[in-house]
């Protein structure tokens, strides 16, 4: 294992129990699924986040759930990346995406925040857009006048929650490919 081969995988969400199972916490739930699959305990606290570390396919991995609330996610992610000397292109972010149907994955090597305040905070704190992300479809608002905050902070109906959890094996495989330097392959296999 290369000593410099370390990845930070951050799942975005809001920390209070009342947000468990909400659309905006799809990133937290996905990170929990990875932690469970990889047998990494995410229970230590540092830089306003819950974190744990382990090894996956020969890569050192730090898993992080920022406890800053969504809109300040970068305030936890940037210091954690700095502490472990992890470059931005080795920071993989898992977050919700209202432009995609529930369970659809959108893997990107970089890009704008696309209206996502958690991504905006990370871009601001890391100083650029050059970090990979897996966006998890949570479904669009039922109509344009529906309040966005009410939608993303609402709970998933069971069928949408299942559509997302059914994709966790694909998300895990995609994360491994990304760490292996095969993001393009992850996109072709798992986008959609």
Which residue stretches match the model-derived regions?
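Nucleotide and nucleotide-moiety/phosphate-recognizing core
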Residues: 1-110, 120-134, 141-147, 154, ...
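Hydrophobic alpha-helical segments within soluble ligand-binding/sensing domains
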Residues: 114-118
